[in-house]
């Protein structure tokens, strides 16, 4: 086992603080509309330019093990905030640094670290309650666009695009961000439920120009197993032919005699039909077939529930206004499912999302939720160079997450103003002077984000903060982008409560741990062995 080095008390905390400062100083320059860029070296390819706090934090690894521990703990603040709210990483880092700096000073002045922590926790609770009280719910598309614009560092086109996407697919809908092949940034919306399975035979195509199958007002047969035997399929085919409607078959597979008969019927013009494989695998396939059944008001034909294919009636089939099938995808538009049943299914999936611990499962459940709840939108981010596209994609991701958070818990005035004003809520008293000091640490730390935003814009931070606090209106603040004081809500400068709250809670949580640290253990760095000496003697027989 390698030898370990141990640091105690003040020495340990000072080294932690040094690591915290190095990481925070690199991250905080990106805060606000006039935040600066950080250039990150990549071992291959062009350097990456970003204004995304968490991307900068992830790149920092320090040589000194004790300092690195401090940096990594602060990095945890940024990643945790990013996981919960998807934005606010830089604000969380700035708050974390401010709380740690003040806390380490207090501990050095012989205050009790545990009482400081109790004071900090009580103060954070009071501030979060105040933020919820002042939160304004988001209703209109304009408000959504404002939040997205701010989080995208003032890019109005991105803000509007995200607002359009959320309007079209609903707040629960899936919005994915991809890199475009062109210089333009564009939005594509897929209405209805789409899954990644195309037609099983090109002979089903009805639109030969686009190689698509378009079925109007079709019946939908949802079958869990393979279909290869024609006999069991005949009764339902005859019933559909008599109704004069098209038919979409979704099954594990359709092969052999069954597929051949369907193709022959289609070519002879007797039946407008298409067959596709069921989406997903294993248990997820069963769940997705159930989703399709709920959406189209049909039943999953499965021997598990005692329904045989030969006994199927038209009432058991699903219905939809339109179905489009391409070589790779199937889209069901406007299924005939009951609103109440769809909502019940949505609630069930939401409950599963809450319970799951796997990120992969959560992502797949969210996809299912979106397909049921409204549809899928894709924002394709374009740019002139690869570096520009990556930087813009970072901002679009941030903006999208911030917007979702805003819809969830509401908004408060932005630019660090909500936290500045929340200091008024700290009229609570600690049980002793050390707890009072903990409350005071948060009171001072709440000014840090507003000061940093002003500083990054080249303004005098103390003057800006002083002027904002002179005015008693909750929404009065400073617009750094235009260098104006006024009503921040009407300027459209707002922050999601979820982002501000998560930033403060995570910063205080990690900072409290750092303040109450009394010892640190790390491996002793290995000394590099000196390079061996060159063998002597020269090369015989060579005279110069």
UniProtKB/Swiss-Prot annotation:
- The main location is cytoplasm
Q: What is its EC number?
A: 5.6.1.7
User: Is Calcium one of the keywords UniProt gives this record?
Assistant: no
InterPro entries, sorted? Chaperonin_Cpn60_CS, Cpn60/GroEL, Cpn60/GroEL/TCP-1, GroEL-like_apical_dom_sf, GROEL-like_equatorial_sf, TCP-1-like_intermed_sf
Example GO molecular function = ATP binding
Residues at which ATP binds: 30-33, 51, 87-91, 415, 495
Oligomer status and interactors? Forms a cylinder of 14 subunits composed of two heptameric rings stacked back-to-back. Interacts with the co-chaperonin GroES.
Q: What name has this protein been given in UniProt?
A: Chaperonin GroEL
Species in which this protein is naturally found:
Bartonella bacilliformis (strain ATCC 35685 / KC583 / Herrer 020/F12,63)
Taxonomy of the source species: Bacteria, Pseudomonadati, Pseudomonadota, Alphaproteobacteria, Hyphomicrobiales
């Amino acid at each position: 086992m390698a030898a370990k080095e141990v640091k105690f008390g003040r020495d340990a905390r000072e080294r932690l603080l040094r690591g915290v400062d190095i990481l925070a100083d690199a991250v905080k320059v990106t805060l606000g509309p006039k935040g600066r860029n950080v250039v990150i070296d990549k071992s291959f390819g062009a350097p990456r330019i970003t204004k995304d706090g968490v991307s900068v934090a992830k790149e920092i690894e320090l040589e000194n093990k004790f300092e690195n521990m401090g940096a990594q703990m602060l990095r945890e603040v940024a990643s945790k905030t990013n996981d919960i709210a998807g934005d606010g990483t830089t604000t969380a880092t700035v708050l974390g640094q401010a709380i740690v700096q003040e806390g380490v000073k207090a501990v050095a002045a012989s205050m009790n670290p545990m009482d400081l922590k109790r004071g900090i926790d009580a103060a954070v609770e009071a501030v979060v309650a105040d933020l919820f009280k002042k939160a304004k719910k988001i209703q209109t598309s304009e408000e959504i666009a404002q939040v997205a614009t701010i989080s995208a560092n003032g890019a109005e086109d991105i803000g509007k695009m995200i607002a359009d996407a959320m309007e079209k697919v609903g707040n629960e809908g899936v919005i994915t961000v991809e890199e475009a092949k062109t210089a333009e940034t564009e939005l594509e919306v897929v209405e209805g439920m789409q899954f990644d399975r195309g037609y099983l035979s090109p002979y089903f195509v009805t639109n030969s120009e686009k190689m698509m199958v378009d079925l109007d007002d079709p019946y939908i047969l949802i079958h869990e197993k393979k279909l290869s035997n024609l006999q069991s399929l005949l009764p339902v085919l005859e019933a559909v032919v008599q109704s004069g409607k098209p038919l979409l078959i979704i099954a594990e597979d359709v092969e052999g005699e069954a597929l051949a008969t369907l193709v022959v019927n289609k070519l002879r013009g007797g039946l407008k039909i298409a067959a596709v494989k069921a989406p997903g695998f294993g248990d997820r396939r069963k769940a997705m077939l159930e989703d399709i059944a709920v959406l189209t008001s049909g039943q999953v034909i499965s021997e598990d529930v005692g329904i045989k294919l030969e006994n199927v009636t038209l009432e058991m089939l699903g219905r939809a206004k339109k179905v489009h099938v391409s070589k790779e995808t199937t889209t069901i538009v406007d299924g005939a499912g009951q609103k109440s049943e769809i909502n019940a299914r949505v609630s069930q999936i939401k409950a599963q999302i809450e319970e799951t611990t796997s990120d992969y499962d959560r992502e797949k459940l969210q996809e299912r939720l979106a397909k049921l709840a409204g549809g899928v939108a894709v924002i394709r981010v374009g740019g002139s160079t690869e570096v520009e596209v990556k930087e813009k994609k970072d901002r679009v991701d941030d903006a999208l997450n911030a917007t979702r958070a805003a819809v969830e818990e509401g908004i408060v005035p932005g630019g660090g103003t909500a936290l500045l004003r929340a200091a008024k809520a700290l009229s609570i008293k600690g049980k002793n002077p050390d707890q009072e000091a903990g409350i005071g640490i948060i009171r001072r730390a709440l000014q840090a984000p507003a000061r940093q935003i002003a500083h990054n814009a080249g303004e005098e931070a103390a003057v800006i903060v002083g002027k904002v606090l002179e005015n008693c209106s909750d929404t009065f603040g400073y617009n750094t982008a235009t260098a104006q004081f006024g009503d921040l809500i009407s300027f459209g400068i707002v922050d999601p409560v979820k982002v501000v709250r998560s930033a403060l809670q995570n910063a205080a949580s990690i900072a409290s741990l750092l303040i109450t640290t009394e010892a640190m253990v790390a491996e002793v760095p290995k000394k590099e062995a000196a390079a061996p000496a060159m063998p002597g003697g020269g090369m015989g027989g060579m005279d110069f």
